[in-house]
Amino acid sequence: MLDRRDFLRLSALASLGTLAGCATTPAAARIRPITRGPKFHWRGYYDKFLFSADDRFVLANEVDFEGRSPTKADSIRVGMVDTQDGDRWIDLGGSNAWNWQQGCMLQWVPGSDRHVAWNDREDGQFVTRVLDVKSNRTRTLPHPFYTFSPDGKTAFAPDFARLDVTRPGYGYATGAERDIWKLKPAPDDTGIWRMDMATGQQRLLFT
């Protein structure tokens, strides 16, 4: 039977052998930056579809400042990087509805190899932009989105203005005072919304 000292010695030798084996294993992938300064680039949340179906294009947000929270006047650019053409930046549009945590929800629409969606602001209201990257045509839907159904036909979203007060950093700035105690508790006219991506029709699911 091994005593404690022998057990620790053998365990240490086994660990060294494992590390030695790792040291001789060649790297399986090469990592490189695909965006360049002087502007700042980031992607947003990890659950978004950022790679095109063929893995050639990668979506990203672009902004010219950092170190402070965005205001309702701040805008960003959205684009995609062509990884097969010297990581060339392709500008797709802009957004005035975004935050540092999640950007403007920029992503490929599930099930599509040509449609990209993001949130924006128009006439004081949050909206969804849907761009066909092959025809360069853009549709605007009258409400924002947070996530899509797996088939990309339905979108779901919270109240981003209310979220900016209840969870600063995750909603979109409106200029309103961020005082949670001044909000109406559990209002009947807002909550989690469902939107038809074909028609833009919206329905309140939960309050």
Regions found by a protein language model. Give the residues of each.
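Blade-loop segments of beta-propeller domains
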Residues: 45, 73-116
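Beta-propeller blade signature
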Residues: 76-83, 130-132, 189-197
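Surface-exposed loop and turn segments in beta-propeller and other repeat-based domains
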Residues: 35-40, 93-99, 202-207
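Asp-box/WD-like beta-propeller blade repeats and closely related beta-sheet repeat scaffolds
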Residues: 103-105, 119-191, 206-207
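Beta-strand-rich domains and repeat architectures in extracellular enzymes and scaffolds
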Residues: 34-73
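Residue position within the beta-strands of beta-propeller blades
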Residues: 58-61, 115-119, 157
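Structural signature of eukaryotic scaffold interfaces centered on beta-propeller domains
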Residues: 47-52, 107-111, 148-149
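N-terminal export signals
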Residues: 6-24
